[in-house]
Amino acid sequence: MGEKQRQKAISYLNEDRLYFASLFILIPEIEALDLYEKLNSRNAVALKICAKILKDENLFAHVAGLVSENSSMTYSALKWMLKTGSADDSLNDDYDEVMDAVASLLIKTYKDNSVLPMVADMIFKRNRKGYLVHDLVWCFFQARTSYCLKLIAGYLRSPNRRDVELARQLLHFIPDETGEGANLQKQYQNFLAWLQENNQFLYFTGENLQFTSDPKPCRVDLDAKYLYKSISPYNHKPLQSLTQAEQDHLQQFHELRREDEKLLSKYSRRMHDRNLRSWNQWMQYPVDKQIEIAKAGLGGIR
């Protein structure tokens, strides 16, 4: 290759508008033409990340000493890789492995929830093609935010049957949201109503498709809902300490049947929002009296 063509190749690789997929595809040419030392810092860091993920010792040997990256440079490269590379997901197995790891690093290590729509899009695109989505779904839910649920619920309204089926599968733990007979828009509206009622009482379990065919990645803490105490979605702990009276109520609450726990927590949540004074009075009663009132549906709250 002449020097003019070589310079043209270097200029193309270091172009601001370059997509990560192009860099990835051109790795063999970069090696054949020995262009590693001509790469800009973005590309050098990106290839170093690829080498670590793929355990490619040859590639790592070429790029390890090119740049001394810091956390900011690594984050910037990861964001570029996902932002420009997600559209080319399913390019090949190695590429998908890299994209999975990049998504995981951005979500788990850098706590960047802005990438969640891109990751959700990758999940559903892969599923349409019949590819496995287990790893991506796992890292997606590691964000441990109800934003994940909202993004998935959006696919309930998709015209693509596979999108709807996957959304139902991932949201099946939510009652009344995934019934086959329900209108798709109605399912979505039901989900939004459920989320509004339960959002501050949700915690994430870590269950995923890698270990079970019926994962429940998220649950409602009925204790927290009954006491109207927000909890951390990360560690399932109340954000405020419980009073002795609240602890005593919980002890009685735990003696109820599961169905009555659900009824009481739902009634408590709705009464708290509609009439705080009545809720405070209701919380002074013994749990059996609370159940009696809840089942009677006093005040139109059920």
Residue ranges and their predicted role:
Residues I107-K108, F141:
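C-terminal helix/turn sub-motif of individual leucine-rich repeats
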Residues A101-S104, V115-P117, K125-N127, Y131, ...:
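Short N-terminal edge-element motif at the start of the domain
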Residues Y110-K111, R144:
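Ankyrin-repeat interhelical turn detector
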Residues M1-D100, R128-V133, Q142-R302:
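Long, helix-rich interaction regions
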Residues G65, L105-I107:
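Intrinsically disordered, low-complexity boundary segments flanking structured domains
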